[in-house]
């Protein structure tokens, strides 16, 4: 009985190793810009302030579980503060979790289509510090649920290193602090693929 158990466990371990070998993991870092409706074009339901402008560093990763399908996530934030109404400093942060479809386009390229949900966290900075039970901060946050869709093109100039031009469209719920309820992010990321 012990011999049979050992053989079954060894077989499962070997099969698991083969399945793990077929998986792919990508990590990337990039820079992008965010664009949305300008403050001058804000409708009556939205505050006349643009969420875009400035440079947005981005960190992202994905894990392809089955052939070209997987999951991923990313976070982007404005590198410097912007001013709301010319006097109140703020910084938007976008984060999302996505379903990913990444079919290869030959040996040196892959398409990346994604869609999912996440959030927009807007930090409004103050000139004073507010303390709670465990920590202190100099900002208050306004958080909003968002849905996103995106596309990217991974180009592999060297083995597993890729350059990815990318676009994301965010549909932000109750984004009343800004001039519209959607924003577009355009950027370029450099990354590495494990398991390609």
What are these regions (language model features)?
Residues 16-22:
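Sec/Tat signal peptide C-region and signal peptidase I cleavage site
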Residues 43-47, 82-88, 133-139, 173-178:
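Extracellular loop and loop/strand-boundary signature of outer-membrane beta-barrel proteins
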């Amino acid at each position: 009985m012990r011999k049979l158990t050992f053989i079954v466990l060894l077989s499962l371990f070997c099969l698991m190793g083969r399945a793990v070998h077929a998986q792919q993991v990508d990590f990337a870092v990039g820079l992008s810009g965010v664009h949305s409706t300008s403050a001058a074009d804000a409708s009556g339901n939205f505050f006349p302030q643009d969420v875009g402008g400035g440079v947005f560093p981005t960190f992202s990763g994905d894990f392809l579980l089955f052939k070209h399908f997987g999951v991923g996530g990313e976070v982007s934030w404005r590198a410097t503060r912007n001013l709301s109404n010319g006097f109140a400093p703020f910084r938007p942060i976008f984060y999302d979790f996505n379903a990913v479809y990444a079919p290869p386009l030959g040996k040196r390229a892959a398409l990346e289509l994604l869609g999912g949900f996440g959030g927009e966290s807007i930090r409004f900075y103050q000139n004073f510090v507010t303390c709670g039970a465990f920590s202190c901060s100099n900002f208050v946050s306004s958080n909003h649920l968002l849905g996103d869709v995106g596309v990217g093109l991974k180009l592999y100039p060297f083995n597993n290193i890729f350059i990815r031009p990318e676009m994301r469209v965010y549909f932000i719920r109750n984004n009343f602090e800004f001039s519209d309820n959607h924003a577009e992010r355009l950027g370029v990321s450099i990354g590495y693929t494990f398991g390609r």
